[in-house]
Amino acid sequence: VAEFSLQEELSELFTLSLMLVSKRADIDLESLLLQSVKFRVVFNDVEQRQVSGIITQATRGDTHARRTIYYLTVQPALWRMNLNQDSRIYHRQSVPEILTSLLKKHCILFDCQLDEFHYTREYVTQKRESDYAFFARLVAEEGLNFWFEDDKLFFSDSHLGMTANLPLVYNPQIETATEMNVMNQARLGVSMTPARVIYKDYNPQSPDYRLTHRANIDPRVEGQKTLFELFESYGRFQKDAEAKPFVQRRHQAVENQRQAGSGQSNCFKLMPGKIFTLSEHPVDAMNTRWQIVTIHHHGKCPQALQEESGESGTYLHNEFSFMSGYNDWRALYRYKPLADGDEVATVVGPEGEEIYVNEEGCIRIHFHWDRYDKADENATCWVRFAQGWNGSGYGFMA
């Protein structure tokens, strides 16, 4: 390996770019695709960290002095979910249950730690989305985070699922560092955000009830009017108990933008899912716990190029963003895909029924794009409808 770059972010796929040197100029690039890769960084004979993934792109570069340069892009096995697009309906499952079924479908090694209660949803629709886009949307919507540890994906609904107690020493003179645990730059800033989050929905069973919930991001606006509000008119809930987690997660996602830090270090152990403790910073408030949100590692080993390496030696450094290690980071909200227009479906029900309705007059339908559900009384969910020939006597109303 002559050079590498590793880009990582909470709740995103990592991308490892490798520049390799080989004596062979005839390596079959097609045979490399989707092959497993393990990349290790060793310092003073001690392994700092291992990154596991699959090859998603391979390029042959220049050949000179009996050596050929190859460029590989490595991403986690979860990336394979981008290759499959589907439309389907999941019935009466919680989001963690849906995510688990997706990961098992693609043979992804995973683990999770869930500290909160996650409601069972009547139905969840995947519509013309890749499996990964659907996965990422549900993760953000449900307030989950995911990251990668060795060859395994890990997801959690709390920062308590992260690995803590990674020590970093602040030293702005990085050239004097003798260990790979030095942070040589630390910046902390604040940004303006909306002051309040408001979610509203409508329950036809209680049409007069104002199904509205709010959360104040800025405590100074408690009980006051503000121009800066984030209002969602479609909250995706039917009960107060279901609304509170949605509002709280959106509140946390916006609040995460209020204060954020950035830094540089030589520590390859830093990664999303890690909480580090900073020490020896001249500002006392900085000597506390912080969690990694994004990080970009870059390393170079010129010796791999032999006579072309010049006088420079091996080096590794990174740039990263971080937030408080005591708060929960939430991914930015992802909106679900919208239908292009009217959807064609067939009204369904049990065999022998003229029309199958519930106590509220709702019907069940089977969408023509649904490849997984049978066209019977278990298809989709109960759907409200309006037509000219409705009412208790099926009479026409004009």
Region locations from a protein language model:
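Amphipathic alpha-helical and helix-coil boundary elements used as assembly
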Residues: 1-398
